[in-house]
Regions:
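Acidic-enriched, low-complexity/disordered segments with a strong bias for Aspartate over Glutamate
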Residues: 7-8, 26, 42, 60, ...
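Short aromatic-glycine-(Arg/Gly/Cys) micro-motifs in beta-strand/loop hairpins
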Residues: 30-58
Length: 91
């Protein structure tokens, strides 16, 4: 089950586990992106997180809306299916 909170941010949408690219570090380490959650803190901005297979955030990008987050990933990757996290309605 996908977490409702990541890095103290509320999860609004997420993807199924997949291969969404990788991040290469200067020290030679490679981390693979397995999840793409869209989250928010208490402000009105939204973050597109890149998470590893342990749901750890390894990169984030700030946008003004959920739609901007989705459009950014939909342009760079084909056929992303976004899953709405209905659990956030209890907060």
């Amino acid at each position: 089950m996908f977490p409702n909170i990541l890095d103290d941010a509320l999860v609004h949408f997420y993807t199924q586990k997949g291969n969404y690219g990788s991040i290469y570090y200067d020290n030679g380490k490679i981390e693979y992106i397995h999840y793409l959650p869209i989250c928010s803190y208490d402000n009105k901005e939204y973050y597109l997180f890149h998470c590893n297979n342990k749901f750890e955030v390894i990169a984030d990008y700030l946008f003004d809306s959920i739609e901007e987050c989705m459009n950014m990933e939909n342009r760079s990757k084909k056929e992303i299916v976004w899953i709405k996290n209905n659990c956030n309605e209890i907060y």
